């Protein structure tokens, strides 16, 4: 992964336009996905006169740099005792991105969850399985650090057909 992006060059004007999205100014914890960052969003940014006529390779390189910069900013804000970062999900297949992230965060060890014996592609499924187990056991889960919830709660529900 990342071969296409690795053939392009990051375009600073485009990168600045991408970083102007209000999401990046939000304080953690935060989460997002395709509801905000999608082809329609990218097309709107690319239609801006400041960033017209960028090659597809350069768009890919710039998007990769955006991912790297935004992750690195959060990692560099962590306490100094955090030395290892475990990556999971589809992005772990992007060797170009992981190499950029490691270069941007030289004081952190950037590895996949494979180092813990957990396939990076399976971590989300494993997490949801654990959440389901907690629900079946009627055990509340405290996700305050991730969601800003003020108390632990039973997540999900069981509905018999």
Where are these regions (language model features)?
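Conserved ATP-utilizing enzyme core subdomain
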Residues: 1-68, 72, 151-161
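Catalytic phosphate/nucleotide-handling subdomain of diverse soluble enzymes
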Residues: 69-153
């Amino acid at each position: 992964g990342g071969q296409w992006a690795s053939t392009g060059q990051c375009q600073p004007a485009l990168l600045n336009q991408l970083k102007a999205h209000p999401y990046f100014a939000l304080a953690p914890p935060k989460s997002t996905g395709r509801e905000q960052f999608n082809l329609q969003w990218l097309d709107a940014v690319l239609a801006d006169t400041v960033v017209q006529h960028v090659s597809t390779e350069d768009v890919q390189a710039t998007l990769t740099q955006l991912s790297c910069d935004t992750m690195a900013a959060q990692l560099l804000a962590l306490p100094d005792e955090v030395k290892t970062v475990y990556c999971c999900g589809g992005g772990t297949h992007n060797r170009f991105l992981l190499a950029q992230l490691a270069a941007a965060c030289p004081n952190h060890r950037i590895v996949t969850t494979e180092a813990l014996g957990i396939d990076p592609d399976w971590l989300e499924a494993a997490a949801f399985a654990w959440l389901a187990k907690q629900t079946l056991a009627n055990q509340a889960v405290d996700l305050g650090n991730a969601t800003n919830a003020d108390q632990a709660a039973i997540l999900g529900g069981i509905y018999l057909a």
